[in-house]
Amino acid sequence: FLGCRRLREIVLNGTEEERALRTSQGIGRMLALAVTILHDYFLFDPTNVGKDEWVKRWDEKLLALLALDDLDGFEELWTCGEEDYEGKDYDIKSYPVEKRKMKLRVVYFRLLHAYKLSDIVKDTLMAYLCRHTKGTDAPEAWEVIVEEHRSELDYYRIFAEAGCITEDNFADLLEDIKDSDAEIKAFLLRYKEEHFDRKDAFAAFDLMW
């Protein structure tokens, strides 16, 4: 099963409470990603899963994945005539887009399950989100949310915390989620009020004096 790219979680033996705790921490998903995405079979070690050194190595592998060129693997895929990413065929334009989305799915997961996540790694992951926000040449950080997690508020919170919502892209973000739940739209509008409108109000106040 380790060769199955759709493997989502590996559940380790333990009490019901232990299994529930690992699920909340994302340990089972981290273990699955270690072999399906990060391709590090040394991390497939149930005796060390969740320990400090294991988490550190996992995060190092994630950062190494983000550092890879988005066309990495394309030449081999093309020359071998294989299919990648859930059985779909890709050309030189669509391949890097899907590669970034794959990376971003893991980034979002790690930020949502910040078990023993260091500040340095967290800052690096958030900076990666910002490089792919709405309004950039490669806005997949936003596209992943809209296409796959449109109604999941936690994803918008991570997106906002990373600094991906700006005055320049706010109107476009709001347009993209016009058909989303009221909770999502309220979150964005509240963010605008707290971060942008207040600044405008202070600027107007300064002009008065």
Tell what function each PLM region has.
Residues 4-6, 150-151, 163-168, 179-180:
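Alpha-helix capping and inter-helical loop/turn segments
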Residues 5-6, 11-17:
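Concave beta-strand-loop units of leucine-rich repeat
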Residues 27-83:
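A conserved mid-domain beta-alpha-beta active-site/ligand-binding segment of alpha/beta enzyme cores
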